[in-house]
Regions:
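Peripheral, non-transmembrane regulatory/ligand-interaction domains of membrane transport proteins
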Residues: 1-222, 231-244
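Non-transmembrane, extramembrane segments of multi-pass ion/lipid transporters
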Residues: 178-179, 227, 248, 252
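Hydrophobic alpha-helical transmembrane segments and their immediately adjacent juxtamembrane loops
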Residues: 234-299
């Protein structure tokens, strides 16, 4: 898929959306009118020159651009003079059951929001479509509300991933003692590893949401917007609690499975021991009479 930039412009009484393909020619992005909020969503943009050209009107620091071009960033929030920079991660399960991740970045200013995503997973596509179908829901809203919608979408995406994760946990739990030929231990280990990856992201993301909800020096978020952000923070806490419960279940399944395998092996060893005891006299007699002697005075 080709790189693209999706633009949404709105004010109290205007609304427009534009799409630009990011090829060799630099796109001519529409300039917002006075009083308009400008949301630019970048998908798969890896060209430093294109980013610098597009972000120049917003005064974005070169270190922020460097972070955006990076594929791996821990969730964090940084306060610059006229905008906030937020780094996050999202996950999705492939058809093969592999947990893949993608970087998401947000730059939130007074009258603009810039969002960045490497893979075209459609994280914010539904939000753009809802805006297009019902513009009244966003008309007149400030950038704080738009940023809340994006952050809430990120958290909602985690609920989808966690539901899939829990479904996999339940499936393995049901087949724990049934399918002896499958790679149960390998599946449990993958679930344990997935839980570690998700938790490693959700913990710092919790700190990001907490700062957004309580810090008074973030002038972009104030008043009613902090109420929405506290809701996002609460949802993040729910995710962590649910993930911890699922992780404990996975660890219990591993202990139970290993104990089951150990008991089964002990049972097999007992059977082999009984068989050995039964056949040992026969083996001794066969060994004695099978020796190459003409005369055996002892007998």
């Amino acid at each position: 898929p080709r790189s693209a930039i999706h633009q949404t412009l709105y004010s109290a009484d205007t609304f427009a959306q534009h799409d630009y393909l990011a090829g060799k020619k630099l796109p001519d992005i529409a300039r917002p009118q006075a009083g308009q909020t400008n949301w630019l969503h970048f998908v798969g943009i890896n060209d430093a020159a294109l980013l610098k050209y597009t972000l120049e009107p917003y005064g974005i620091h070169e270190l922020v651009i460097e972070d955006i071009l990076s594929r791996k960033q821990r969730p964090k929030i940084e306060d610059y003079d006229n905008y906030l920079f937020i780094a996050a991660q999202v996950y999705h399960y492939t058809a093969a059951g592999k947990l893949n991740s993608d970087q998401v970045y947000l730059i939130i200013g007074k009258d603009f929001v810039l969002s960045f995503q490497q893979k075209p997973l459609g994280l914010f596509s539904q939000l753009r479509r809802q805006m297009s179908e019902n513009p009244r829901g966003i008309l007149g809203k400030n950038t704080a509300f738009l940023a809340y919608c994006l952050l809430d979408r990120i958290v909602d995406d985690y609920f989808i991933v966690l539901e899939e994760y829990n479904n996999r946990v339940e499936a393995i739990d049901k087949s724990l003692f049934k399918d002896e030929n499958s790679d149960i231990l390998g599946k449990i280990h993958r679930l344990k590893r997935d839980a570690v990856r998700l938790r490693r992201t959700l913990l710092p993301l919790r700190d990001v949401f907490y700062q957004l909800a309580v810090r008074v020096d973030f002038t972009i978020f104030k008043g009613e917007s902090t109420v929405y952000l506290r809701d996002v923070y609460d949802h993040n806490m729910q995710l962590l609690e649910s993930l911890d419960a699922s992780r404990d279940m996975v660890l219990s399944m591993m202990d139970i499975y290993l104990s089951f395998q150990s008991n089964r092996m002990n049972q097999q060893m007992r059977v082999l021991t009984v068989i050995t005891i039964i056949f040992m006299p026969l083996t001794v007699i066969t060994g004695i009479y099978g020796m190459n002697f003409d005369n055996m005075p002892e007998l």
